[in-house]
Amino acid sequence: MARHASSASESSGGVSSNSAAIAAASSCRGTTCSMAAHIPSRLSTFGGGISPVSVSTCSLVVSNTTWNAVANFADARSTRGRDFSFSFALSRSALASSFVAISTSSRSSASSTARDVRYTVVASSVARRRASECRRSSDALPSTPYRDSSASRRGGIRDTSTAPIPNAAISSARSSARFICGPDTRTGPRLSRSSSETRSPGGTVQPKSPAPLAARCSASRAGCPTAAGSLLPAPRPPASSASSPQAAAPAAPSATRLPRRTTPSAPRPSSRPARPPIPAARPPPRRTPGTPRPAAARARAPAGCSPARRTPSAPTDRRCRAARRGSPRPPAARPPGRQGTRRDSARL
């Protein structure tokens, strides 16, 4: 560092020597920002213009920046991955900027070199400040591992579990409660016509439904005795035993007679006597060819025409129609040559 300062003082004087002295005095990372602030101000106060800066002065400034970036890179690696991804990227950008400053240090223009150095110093200081803040925030949070408490384990053993022990009596009462909705499995007619809201919780006792009609009919055909209270009569004896005196005697009524069961569809017996059937009307007598016609029919039909049978002669039909209309003179007869035409033959 002393060698760079002496070479800078021999090669240039005035403003350049002051800048080299300030850069040599900054041997730590904390004074890098102040160095970047002094370089542009010193360059701008020289006789109203900017003088060229030697290569040795730029090399001194770049060497300080490079050392600062390398220190930040080592500091980022020492964090062992906590904020390594953040500070490592910024340190690499600062190191790349320093290489850009080294490549541009051979130029004759001092303004470009000062601008690159200023940006490099600012980037490296921001990276160092953010890395320290990340370390402080991570150290403030205590690292507590996950612990499984006994309160969160409902399926554990009874000594460690805090779940309430189920009561068997309450569970059975809940499963068989009357207010639980379910399908109505009762069959047969209901004794109560009330709705489900007014029905008692216990329900009503339903009678047993009778045997199916097909089963009762098959039992009666087989000759088996019917059950008490059935609607079918007792089976009759066969026809071969009807000639015996025992079969001719009427059957004695049973001692215990059950009341007859009626259904809503069956008609009720009436106490009024049944009406006699109305006899059918007698058909009119059939006339024979020798039977004379009644006088009324003979007065209505004129002479020579029969209402039941048409004659094949056309003049006869015309006379009959004229007589019915009341015409006094009969129609003129056809000539003999016109007799037996196709129309007359079709009427036959």
Swiss-Prot record:
Biased amino acid composition, Polar residues: 192-207
Keyword Acyltransferase: no
Keywords, sorted A to Z: Transposable element
Region (Disordered): 132-348
Compositionally biased residues, Pro residues: 274-287
Organism name: Streptomyces fradiae (Streptomyces roseoflavus)
Record protein name field: Uncharacterized 35.5 kDa protein in transposon Tn4556
Residue spans of biased composition, Low complexity class: 161-178, 227-273, 288-310
